[in-house]
Amino acid sequence: MFDAIPVLSSAECERVRQTVHALRSSWIARGSADYPFYTVGAASYIDAVSRTPPPRYSEILVETNPVLREHFHWLYARLMNKLSVHLQAVVRTADELALPGFHVWQGLSVPTSSLSVHFDLQYMSIPWPDVPRSDRSQPLSFTLPIALPRGGGGLNTWDLSYEEQAAHFQATGKFTPVEEMAKSRTRTFHPYTQGVLTLHSGHTLHQIAAVDQAYPDDERITLQGHGLYCDGAWTIYW
């Protein structure tokens, strides 16, 4: 699955961008001192995994979910409606999980080199409600570009699935890093369009695409989220 779903007009993207900037005090610094980026909201791939410091996912979402809901309630309603129509199923959020949130890169920190190649397996780490009734075989991931740098933006994917990697390990007893497996696979670049949601399986190997050059006035703002089918509906989160 790799689908493009129009969600916002240019004017609506600008409205979201301005609101994100108005919430500057709610940005959470990520990355390094040399190449910082920010999130608005709890990000499961950072805040829910077992690293040092200990996971703070639930603690952060208690603070950030009310802020996001207050300022972007109309955006979430639009997002869930578009996804519901496309997936032909109910789409909802859950109080135990972070709302879809924002990635923010600015200026020369916009990625110009390759970022991590990965599968989206965050659902294994978060406090997922109704786990026995959740279908983990077909997770969803999505990106909605709000503002893109001068060099554009997009997603790199490879024709390699999480299931294939798991089967390889089961057959050989040897864990092969995805970076190594990807060398023999086909890479495809999927360009982003402002206001158009990119929807794909989180079990497809992927990577944020870098730009050739970053400029001081560049900005990259995207709404990020995932989905899991649970008890007859898609629950979206970040």
Language-model segment annotations:
Residues 1-66, 70:
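N-terminal auxiliary "cap/dimerization" subdomain that precedes the catalytic jelly-roll/cupin core
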Residues 8, 103-108, 119-121, 144-148, ...:
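Short, flexible loop/turn elements at secondary-structure junctions
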Residues 13, 20, 88-89, 190-193, ...:
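Localized chelating/binding microdomains
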Residues 49-112, 126-134:
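Signature of the catalytic double-stranded beta-helix
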Residues 94, 136, 215-217:
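Solvent-exposed loop and beta-edge segments used for protein-protein assembly and interaction
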Residues 97-99, 137-143, 152, 205, ...:
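Extracellular structured ligand-interaction cores
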Residues 110-191, 235:
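Catalytic core of non-heme Fe(II) oxygenases with the double-stranded beta-helix
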Residues 168-238:
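Catalytic core of Fe(II)/2-oxoglutarate
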